[in-house]
């Protein structure tokens, strides 16, 4: 099938659901944020946020993974101080004015799709804000809270942290970040998080395909992985559905890690977003799977050939040209 036919004749399939982990943010901004501030991962967060002296003052070994260190904290005052510093650091991060992978992800999906992130950083939210008038964007959800958002528990609305509820005009309340504990009690922490996980179960159960980007499924997230797996198989044994993994880990390790999600081995992996289904068939990813799978018709790829790779305006203009055909459906 020629690319023009795919672009100009979009179909309404079930959702393409994207799950983001810390690796997605690192891939998006490998050299740091707009101000060159380094993106912390769990294995270097103590060093990047400069928690070493604070931990040593309380006779806690600062070396090792933040998940392990945080799980051993017993001093509530120390825990609050660490949480405050973590929040302040992530809240200070910002997107550059140039194109990032976050812009590409959002503009490559449609309103029928969804993005779920475990990340505390503001990049998904900020990318959504600057692209929301370009084309209909996917729904976005923050499974571990986020530094940019607040919520109204009365009306179940959420938005920018400093904003007000569009329904009752109350100022949004802060949403706490979920820290790396083995038992997170997703449905008991706060209303926004509980609703986000209910949404995750619904979207994963209905998904036509899933992309998992930079999420390592750590030990502290086994509760999350199990919830998502149950949702994925809730309505189907997934004999035909496809999962794509974007990660720098070798394919054999990825296949082993995500094998419970792919009983029929409909699985592909790439280390680069530009090789992904999202980028090769922007806003038509489900079509690119459906026609070969059901009719034996291969679909010509059409990755955007941008003259200036980092020009956000050019990316937005190109995606708008693809999206205009969706209005006719």
Where are these regions (language model features)?
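Short coil/turn segments at secondary-structure boundaries
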Residues: 31-32, 128-129, 154-155, 224-225, ...
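Short, flexible loop segments at boundaries between secondary-structure elements
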Residues: 49-54, 141-150, 157, 235-258
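A short alpha->loop->secondary-structure connector
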Residues: 131-142
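Gly/serine-rich nucleotide phosphate-binding loop at the start of the catalytic core
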Residues: 1-124, 133, 318
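Cys/His-rich short segments
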Residues: 142-191
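Short, solvent-exposed loop/turn segments at secondary-structure junctions
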Residues: 23-26, 31-33, 120-124, 146-149, ...
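SIR2/sirtuin-family catalytic core signature
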Residues: 1-20, 26-28, 199-329
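A Trp-anchored, charged/polar loop motif used as the substrate-binding/catalytic surface
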Residues: 1-5, 95-101, 184-202
């Amino acid at each position: 099938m020629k690319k023009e036919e795919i672009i100009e004749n979009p179909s309404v399939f079930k959702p393409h659901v994207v799950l983001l982990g810390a690796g997605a943010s690192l891939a998006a901004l490998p050299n740091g944020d707009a101000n060159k501030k380094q993106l912390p991962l769990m294995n270097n967060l103590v060093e990047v946020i400069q928690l070493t002296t604070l931990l040593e003052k309380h006779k806690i070994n600062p070396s090792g993974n933040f998940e392990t260190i945080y799980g051993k904290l017993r001093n509530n005052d120390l825990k609050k101080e660490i949480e405050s510093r973590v929040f302040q650091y992530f809240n200070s991060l910002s997107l550059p004015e140039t194109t990032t992978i976050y812009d590409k992800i959002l503009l490559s999906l449609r309103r029928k799709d969804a993005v779920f992130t475990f990340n505390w950083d503001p990049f998904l939210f900020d990318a959504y804000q600057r692209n929301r008038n370009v084309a209909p964007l996917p729904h976005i959800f923050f499974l571990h809270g986020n530094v940019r958002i607040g919520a109204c528990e009365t009306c179940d609305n959420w938005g920018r942290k400093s904003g007000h509820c569009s329904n009752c005009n109350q100022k949004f309340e802060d949403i706490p970040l979920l820290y790396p504990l083995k038992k997170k009690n997703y449905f008991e922490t706060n209303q926004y998080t509980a609703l986000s996980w209910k949404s995750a179960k619904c979207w994963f159960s209905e998904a036509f395909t899933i992309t998992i980007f930079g999420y390592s499924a750590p030990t502290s997230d086994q509760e999350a992985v199990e919830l998502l797996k149950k949702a994925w198989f809730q309505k189907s044994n997934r004999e035909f559905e496809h999962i794509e993994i974007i990660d720098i880990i070798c394919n054999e390790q990825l296949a082993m890690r995500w094998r419970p999600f792919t009983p029929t081995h409909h699985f592909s992996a790439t280390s680069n977003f530009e090789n992904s289904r999202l980028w090769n068939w922007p806003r038509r990813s489900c079509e690119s799977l459906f026609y070969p799978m059901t009719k034996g018709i291969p679909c010509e790829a059409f990755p955007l050939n941008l003259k200036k790779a980092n020009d956000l305006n050019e990316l937005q203009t190109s995606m708008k040209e693809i999206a205009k055909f969706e209005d006719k459906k």
